UniProtKB/Swiss-Prot annotation:
The gene is argB. This is Acetylglutamate kinase. SUPFAM superfamilies: Carbamate kinase-like. Catalyzes the ATP-dependent phosphorylation of N-acetyl-L-glutamate. It catalyses: N-acetyl-L-glutamate + ATP = N-acetyl-L-glutamyl 5-phosphate + ADP. It is found in: Cytoplasm. Pathway: Amino-acid biosynthesis; L-arginine biosynthesis; N(2)-acetyl-L-ornithine from L-glutamate: step 2/4. Pfam families: AA_kinase. GO terms for cellular component: cytoplasm.
């Protein structure tokens, strides 16, 4: 009987051993995860996400969660009879709408996420970009048809202070950050794109990895003509593709580009509709999304030698 039980358990042991190189590689490193898409509104996906993040923490990584809340914000605006309008892919945010954004992000979405994480122990602590000047912003004015357009309380990040987040990480906590920020100029509170905020925080924290959860499998090679996913590309390759991307993917991929060009080793866009997608991406060879890596460093000596040989 005991021998049979041992054999039954062997596959589990094999799975754990296969994860060993990845555990060794990522131990002690910071991972910034942008939580969004369908994973925010599906109860099973939310629970699986919380399990993944807590697993990372107990496996020796330092996860930081950044979230938005588009669907929840839209629902609350509709409930209060406030018109939700978009320009240049960004929500026009009046002062009244900003009150709703702030309430939903910090008072609803963040609280639910912190609660899910803390079902596994006293780990998660919620904060917003306002707290301890974590994120500072100015009003963002996009150019539409050649003219600057006022879209209200939409912010563009100008500074990141990682002190509060780093203190939480050092204490073994999981920071959960709502993507709103205060301006040092007019002291207004601004709605900041969560993809952009996650990328800026990843760079400022010198994170190993930025992970962005989406409602697609990754970056498609030739959408809509093909559903083949690009598994890996460099910063320069991504930069060339940006003008061709759909509007919803642009801030995500711009965030990935910013991250890997500012010290982050990898940025990954993964399918948040797949349960435990974070663990699959980090602890297996079979990554399930698109990984962006920095351009290879230029070998100055080799380039100079080649130039001299060509000149001779």
């Amino acid at each position: 009987m005991s021998t049979a039980r041992k054999h039954t358990a062997l596959p589990k042991a094999q799975i754990l051993i296969e994860a060993l190189p990845w555990l060794t590689r990522h131990h002690g490193r910071t991972v910034v995860i942008k939580f969004g898409g369908n994973a925010m509104i599906d109860e099973e996906l939310k629970a699986a996400f919380a399990q993944d993040v807590v697993f990372l923490r107990h496996a020796g990584l330092k996860p930081v969660v950044v979230h938005g809340g588009g669907p929840q914000i839209s629902a609350q605006l509709d409930k209060q009879g406030l018109v939700s309008e978009f320009k240049a892919g960004l929500r026009v945010t009046t002062p009244e709408a900003m009150d709703v954004v702030r309430m939903v992000l910090a008072g609803q979405v963040q609280r639910e996420l912190v609660g899910l994480l803390n079902q596994h122990g006293p780990l998660a602590v919620g904060l917003t970009g306002e707290d301890a000047h974590t994120i500072t912003a100015v009003q963002h004015r996009p150019t539409i048809d050649g003219e600057l357009v006022d879209i209200g309380r939409v912010g563009e990040i100008t500074a990141i202070d990682t002190g509060a987040i780093q203190a939480l990480l050092d204490d073994g906590r999981i920071p959960v950050v709502s993507s709103i920020a205060r301006s040092a100029d007019d002291h207004h509170v601004y709605n900041v794109n969560a993809d952009t905020a996650a990328a800026a925080l990843a760079a400022a924290l010198n994170a190993e990895t930025l992970m962005v959860l989406t409602d697609v499998e990754g970056l498609y090679e030739d959408w809509p003509n093909s559903d083949d996913v690009i598994s890996r590309l460099t910063a320069s390759q991504l930069e060339k593709l940006l003008p061709e991307l759909s509007s919803g993917m642009v801030p995500k991929m711009q965030g990935c580009l910013h991250a890997v060009r500012n010290g982050v080793e990898t940025a990954r866009v993964i399918d948040g509709r797949v349960q435990h997608s974070i663990l699959l991406e980090i602890f297996t060879d079979e990554g399930i999304g698109t990984m962006v890596v920095p351009d290879a460093p230029i070998d100055v000596h080799a380039a100079r030698t080649a130039h001299e040989q060509g000149a001779s």
